[in-house]
Amino acid sequence: MSSKLRVGVAGPVGSGKTALVETLCLSLKKNYEIAIVTNDIFTKEDANFLINKKVLEEGRIIGVETGGCPHTAIREDCSLNKNAVLDLENKYNPLDFVFVESGGDNLASSFSPELVDLSIYVIDVSAGDKIPRKGGPGITRSDLLLINKIDLADKVGADLNIMKSDTEFMRKGKPWFFTNLSIGIGVEEITQFLESHIPNNRN
């Protein structure tokens, strides 16, 4: 028993990871079976937020308390997350998507291939237009990169044209989108990206 697609969502604190998971679940749940695993170091804050927002029924959302480095829990020792995913897959078989949201981390964050099938990395404009050219696995190797909160560009003095140029250089043809998740900009493109990666046959 497994899900068709395990999707990792990573990025710095406050970039919009939970907002992305919320938005995607609301967009996809009419047509797909979905579950969520969230990561926090000492709490289950993100899981409780999604439960309170009624993004999915409560049983489909598991909060993992990693107790340490967010990166370790999704890469070097992903056993807590892997067990949570397996629990959901056994309980709600069949599932189309399982989203695994990492705790906030730096640009070196990446998921173990044992845990997810593809990864989405979220950065936001408020961190400055230099972020894409700083590189790191999240920028260069994620399956999809999102540059969120584009509405804040003028307020923080970020140049979206510079971010676009640097991102295209760093990504080397890999997909990426500008987004403003608070009003739905980019959601349709992300949804189509995910749907295009669903295997034809369940494992």
Swiss-Prot record:
What GO CC annotations are associated with the protein? Answer: cytoplasm
Q: Which InterPro entries match?
A: CobW/HypB/UreG_nucleotide-bd, P-loop_NTPase, UreG
Q: Which organism is it from?
A: Prochlorococcus marinus (strain MIT 9301)
Q: Look up the coiled coil feature and give its residue ranges.
A: none
Q: Describe the protein's quaternary organization and the partners it interacts with.
A: Homodimer. UreD, UreF and UreG form a complex that acts as a GTP-hydrolysis-dependent molecular chaperone, activating the urease apoprotein by helping to assemble the nickel containing metallocenter of UreC. The UreE protein probably delivers the nickel.
Q: Could you say which protein family the record assigns here?
A: Belongs to the SIMIBI class G3E GTPase family. UreG subfamily.
- For this UniProt entry, which segments traverse the membrane? none
Q: Which residues bind GTP?
A: 11-18
What molecular functions are annotated in GO for this chain?
A: GTP binding; GTPase activity; nickel cation binding
**One GO-annotated biological process of the protein:** urea catabolic process
- Gene3D superfamilies found in the cross-reference section: P-loop containing nucleotide triphosphate hydrolases (3.40.50.300)
Role of this protein: Facilitates the functional incorporation of the urease nickel metallocenter. This process requires GTP hydrolysis, probably effectuated by UreG.
Q: What is its main location?
A: cytoplasm
Q: Which UniProt keywords apply?
A: Chaperone, Cytoplasm, GTP-binding, Nickel insertion, Nucleotide-binding
Q: Which SUPFAM superfamilies match?
A: P-loop containing nucleoside triphosphate hydrolases
Name recorded for this polypeptide: Urease accessory protein UreG
